[in-house]
Swiss-Prot record:
Transmembrane segments: 3-23
Family designation: Belongs to the PsbT family.
Major location (coarse): plastid
Cross-referenced Pfam families: PsbT
Gene: psbT
Example GO biological process: photosynthesis
One GO cellular component, as annotated: photosystem II reaction center
Residues in the signal sequence: none
Subunit description: PSII is composed of 1 copy each of membrane proteins PsbA, PsbB, PsbC, PsbD, PsbE, PsbF, PsbH, PsbI, PsbJ, PsbK, PsbL, PsbM, PsbT, PsbY, PsbZ, Psb30/Ycf12, at least 3 peripheral proteins of the oxygen-evolving complex and a large number of cofactors. It forms dimeric complexes.
Role this protein plays: Found at the monomer-monomer interface of the photosystem II (PS II) dimer, plays a role in assembly and dimerization of PSII. PSII is a light-driven water plastoquinone oxidoreductase, using light energy to abstract electrons from H(2)O, generating a proton gradient subsequently used for ATP formation.
Localization annotation: Plastid, Chloroplast thylakoid membrane
Protein's name in the database: Photosystem II reaction center protein T
């Protein structure tokens, strides 16, 4: 059970960092190319 908790915390932390970097830069590729 502890392995599940540690993997969940690791994935959630990586997801938060990824979204922070993604939303910091303007996503011009997704918005301009419709």
């Amino acid at each position: 059970m502890e392995a599940l908790v540690y993997t969940f915390l690791l994935v959630s932390t990586l997801g938060i960092i990824f979204f922070a970097i993604f939303f910091r830069e303007p996503p011009t590729i997704r918005t301009k190319k419709n």
